[in-house]
């Protein structure tokens, strides 16, 4: 697979390494402003999905008589069929009316919410978490930020999956962590390349990230594979950061297994939340869970660093923290079943339609997540250089936005969002088929027929 960094082919703003002083004049006297914008986030901002999506929207054709179909990013909450369950809404309303969610909370989160998260996670674990093992965050993304800041030290590196979730790359860049990539293997149903991990790790490696259920591949790792991951991490002396935010979004046959089950082998730091399972990303509530029966996080001062970083960052809204126990305890299984049934239907719909589009292939149906990864067979197409070129021209000609795989570290692949209403996917696939037909390489017979037709037209004109 390509060693290029995500977004390597996309234009990004240039930043001066030295800022020129800006002079201002007033009443005939000149002085220099002593402030200026920082470029600390410049590198991190070049590996975010938003920049790619905005670029594709900018390329949508203003003269194309079709509505824009935004299937490059995922937010199912905007569609009525994915509205969250009434129990979750009632939990927030009850706290709002009680007035119990209006105050500040402690940096780690309010105790009832931390206890509820521990109880929720303990259903899948052989050891028991306590509230002291749980730290609430403003969504899973803030959890990533807290953990990366807690691990950052001079020369440290972290192992991230390819393809992966670009926010990890962005936060590593912001925190000064060197990123090293290990591959997920499509020919092995996106399993982790464990031999590759051993090849890239060294004495400065601090952790590896496992996303399970996987975003963007949609696979769910088996018990045996996760045990091998834990054994590999222990051999290397590194912790495992397990992103499990899609644990309630599974519609395949493989059951979800929490990485925390293997905490007796290696310390596991779990990142999770309710944004995906309950389809409420705007509520911004997630958590960090320390699966560490041997107390390694305390002796290595990772626990201390997490607490210190939480002290200097914003807390999740207290009103949502206060509602969290009821949200977790009163979860309606029928809601999850309905949501996952819709996603499964959408996966089947897309895969069925792709059978008629030879240049776009889905090697493996996803079993989780809200995306579907497809491989572009560019050898079957004319005048398409790569996945970015494909997606830009698709946006320009069809007002259809898909995410190029390059943004995820997977060159010449493409990600399709399935967390939308089915009629949008039907429309999108008709547009995709038309686009691919126009750009398909002509066979020798077709080329000869076109040439003959042109000659015939010329003779008629004469």
From Swiss-Prot:
CDD domains named among the record's database cross-references: AAT_like (cd00609)
Disruption phenotype: Hyperproliferation of lateral roots. Small and epinastic cotyledons and true leaves. Rare floral organs and sterile flowers. High levels of endogenous free and conjugated auxin.
Disulfide-bonded cysteines: none
InterPro entries listed in its UniProt record: Aminotransferase_I/II_large (IPR004839), PyrdxlP-dep_Trfase (IPR015424), PyrdxlP-dep_Trfase_major (IPR015421), PyrdxlP-dep_Trfase_small (IPR015422), TyrNic_aminoTrfase (IPR005958)
Protein EC: 4.4.1.-
GO cellular component: cytosol; mitochondrion
Named cofactor requirement(s): pyridoxal 5'-phosphate
Superkingdom of this protein's organism: Eukaryota
Molecular function (Gene Ontology), one example: pyridoxal phosphate binding
Any one of the GO BP annotations: regulation of cell growth by extracellular stimulus
Keywords from the UniProt entry: Growth regulation, Lyase, Pyridoxal phosphate
Function in brief: C-S lyase involved in glucosinolate biosynthesis. Converts S-(alkylacetohydroximoyl)-L-cysteine to thiohydroximate. Functions in auxin homeostasis. Probably required for glucosinolate activation in response to pathogens.
Family per record: Belongs to the class-I pyridoxal-phosphate-dependent aminotransferase family.
Protein name per its UniProtKB record: S-alkyl-thiohydroximate lyase SUR1
Originating species: Arabidopsis thaliana
């Amino acid at each position: 697979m390509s060693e290029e960094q995500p977004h390597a082919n996309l234009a990004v703003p240039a930043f001066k390494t030295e800022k020129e002083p800006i002079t201002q004049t007033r009443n005939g006297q000149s002085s220099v402003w002593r402030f200026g914008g920082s470029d600390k986030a410049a590198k991190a901002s070049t590996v975010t999905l938003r920049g790619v999506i905005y670029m594709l929207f900018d390329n949508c054709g203003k003269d194309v008589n079709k509505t824009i179909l935004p299937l490059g990013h995922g937010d199912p909450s905007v569609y009525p069929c994915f509205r969250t369950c009434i129990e979750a809404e009632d939990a927030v309303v009850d706290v709002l009316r009680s007035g119990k969610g209006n105050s500040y909370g402690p940096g780690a989160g309010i105790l009832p919410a931390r206890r509820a998260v521990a109880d929720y996670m303990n259903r899948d674990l052989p050891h028991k978490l306590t509230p002291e093992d749980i730290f609430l965050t403003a969504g899973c993304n803030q959890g990533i930020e807290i953990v990366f800041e807690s691990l950052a030290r001079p020369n440290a590196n972290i192992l991230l999956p390819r393809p992966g979730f670009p926010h990890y790359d962005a936060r590593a860049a912001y925190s000064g962590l060197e990123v090293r990539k290990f591959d997920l293997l499509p020919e092995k149903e996106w399993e982790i390349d464990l031999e590759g991990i051993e090849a890239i790790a060294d004495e400065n490696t601090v952790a590896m990230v496992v996303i399970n259920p996987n975003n963007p591949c949609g696979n769910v790792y088996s018990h045996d594979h996760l045990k091998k991951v834990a054994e590999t991490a222990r051999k290397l002396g590194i912790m495992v950061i397990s992103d499990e935010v899609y644990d309630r979004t599974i519609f395949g046959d493989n059951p979800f297994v929490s990485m925390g089950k293997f905490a007796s082998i290696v310390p596991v730091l779990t990142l999770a939340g309710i944004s995906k399972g309950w389809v409420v990303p705007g509520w911004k509530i997630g958590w960090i869970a320390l699966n560490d029966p041997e107390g390694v996080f305390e002796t290595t001062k990772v626990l201390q660093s997490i607490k210190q970083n939480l002290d200097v960052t914003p807390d999740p809204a207290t009103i949502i923290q206060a509602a969290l126990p009821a949200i977790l305890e009163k979860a309606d299984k029928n809601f999850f079943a309905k949501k996952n049934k819709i996603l499964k239907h959408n996966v089947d719909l897309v895969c069925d339609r792709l059978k008629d589009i030879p240049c776009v292939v889905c090697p493996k149906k996803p079993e989780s997540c809200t995306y579907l990864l497809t491989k572009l067979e560019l050898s079957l197409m004319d005048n398409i250089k790569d996945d970015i070129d494909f997606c830009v021209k698709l946006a320009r000609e069809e007002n259809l936005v898909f995410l190029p795989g390059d943004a995820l570290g997977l060159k010449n692949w493409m990600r399709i969002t399935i967390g939308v209403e089915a009629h949008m996917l039907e429309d999108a696939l008709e547009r995709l088929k038309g686009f691919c037909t126009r750009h398909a390489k002509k066979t020798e017979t077709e080329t000869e027929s076109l040439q003959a037709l042109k000659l015939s037209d010329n003779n008629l004109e004469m």
